Amino acid sequence: MRLCDRDIEAWLDEGRLSINPRPPVERINGATVDVRLGNKFRTFRGHTAAFIDLSGPKDEVSAALDRVMSDEIVLDEGEAFYLHPGELALAVTLESVTLPADLVGWLDGRSSLARLGLMVHVTAHRIDPGWSGCIVLEFYNSGKLPLALRPGMLIGALSFEPLSGPAVRPYNRREDAKYRNQQGAVASRIDKD
């Protein structure tokens, strides 16, 4: 059962759930909290790689990822990031979220953006118990026109679901947690699997 707005506010007030900066009450809806787009992005560079062998030797996968991913792009206030049709880009939420070991989060994109062809998360919309950091967004423009994305715009909504008990291996305590405490648009770390 997901938390309702009243319970989301109570968990925030009690410090069991942290969203920083804390959203105003107007952004806490029936069962969700609106999140905004941050100012950090990462894209695929122009490259000549025919493919990336995801199951190949880890050092080769790592080198291939380094060749095809851009450095982090940080926008100044008022600047726009343009996502063209058929392009994939990583971005980050403005808000940093910390979940306790007994709560899982879910990110959903906005329907109004999806109707323009913008996918906010390609597949990864679960936020694990024990997570702490900004949430990386996996943007894909499946529409026909470039989309201008500006930091601060509403980009999605988080919902929260209590677990039957605290996780024994929450994300923040796992040795293999590849994206622990991320604050930027961190590229794939599949080579760490």
UniProtKB/Swiss-Prot annotation:
Inhibited by dTTP, which binds to the active site and stabilizes the inactive form of the enzyme. Inhibited by inorganic phosphate. Signal peptide: none annotated. It holds the Pfam family DCD. The keyword Methyltransferase does not apply. GO terms for cellular component: cytosol; protein-containing complex. Keywords: Hydrolase, Nucleotide metabolism, Nucleotide-binding. Pathway: Pyrimidine metabolism; dUMP biosynthesis; dUMP from dCTP (dUTP route): step 1/2. DCTP binds at residues 110-115, 124-128, 136-138, 171-174, 178, 182. The active site is at E138 (proton donor/acceptor). Changing S111T: 30-fold decrease in kcat. Shows altered dTTP inhibition. GO terms for biological process: dTTP biosynthetic process; dUMP biosynthetic process; dUTP biosynthetic process; nucleobase-containing small molecule interconversion; protein homotrimerization; response to radiation. Its EC number is 3.5.4.13. One of its GO terms (molecular function) is dCTP deaminase activity. Changing V122G: Loss of activity. Catalyzes the deamination of dCTP to dUTP. Homotrimer. This is dCTP deaminase. It comes from Escherichia coli (strain K12).
